[in-house]
């Protein structure tokens, strides 16, 4: 029996051609739309910070006119000179660095140790202790009792008032404990068979395997410690050498609000009278303060980004 070839008619051939074209055009349109959308999103996200940088490098008297977008009209360093004119700003910077590093390291180590302990099913008091820590997330004694507690602990006007209260975090403990729950139990059991104790298991197995979530927690703790100024205002305001960078910048910003009308206040903030009257305004000072306070965290974030993205997915995938 002879083979018969069936050739498509003109109508079906045209339909096939249209489908092929549509299959080629649709991905191009989709990618083009996504690219345009992401470019717009990046511009919307980055422009406020870029504009803040522009304002910080522009003369304050000119900034009041408005219309600053991508480049300063009257470029000046005067805003940053006003920020760094105070001799206390450098000491405050190192206090903030020391506070941030110590708070982050101690919080990570102690909170992870607590999370590992409360993740062990054989621990008898696991549930009541977990409940106690969760309650601290909802109930706070308040500012005045907190101050008297710090006073009774002899932490007022000491560096450790920045570190000790932040050594344990209930929320971070819950996040880390959730991550520890994804680590195979067989690893712990094998280590115990080999004679390893709980602390050795924690240091050699659990802690290294928690790097992704610890990087995420480290970023949260570090940003919180770096940006904090209210505790310096409450607990160490009478001891200038313990002032933090954020507290000094906050005082400078507050002083600049009255700089034009009260040059004496400007001089107290490290600004000359000429700068206070013409080159520096509260808006330009605020922009410079924002940049100075943000740069250290922006420099650290790229190195943490890989672990940060992984850590955000903790608990989102159930194996």
Q: What kind of region is each of these model predictions?
A:
Residues 2-319:
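A hydrophobic, multi-pass inner-membrane permease signature
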